[in-house]
Amino acid sequence: MSRSATIRSVTEWHIVVDLSRRRVTVYRAGHRVRVFKAVVGKPSTPTPQGEFFVEESIALRAGDVGAPFALALSARSNVLQEFDGGPGQIALHGLANIGGVLGTAVSHGCVRLADDTMRWLVARVGPGVPVTITS
């Protein structure tokens, strides 16, 4: 599917990542539910912009980078063809074992959120939820 194709979803959830504000806003049925501070990609490895969707929800082990959870997106890095042995896939994930101050641009392209935020998100959203990443 081309990135210019319309993404349709039957879910009432929608996630919007605002790169300039370094915020993630979660909507349900068109109403804003929560807004979270985030870490986004640094200038050399920016978070790609566009219309994407959650491909899968992954529970990570306590020692894993990005634990406790990751929401893998259909987005791919425009810079990194691979990362940490895998494809340059973009995800929303926790801060465990990787850090970064919320509200900064220091990641390799993924969107990092507080661990409690990730627990809240994975309890509500899953595969198919649309994700808009914009500046």
Give, region by region, the residue ranges found by the protein language model.
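Exported/periplasmic cell-wall-interacting domains
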Residues: 2-12, 42-51, 58-135
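A structural motif detector for short, solvent-exposed N-terminal "entry" segments of globular domains
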Residues: 2-42
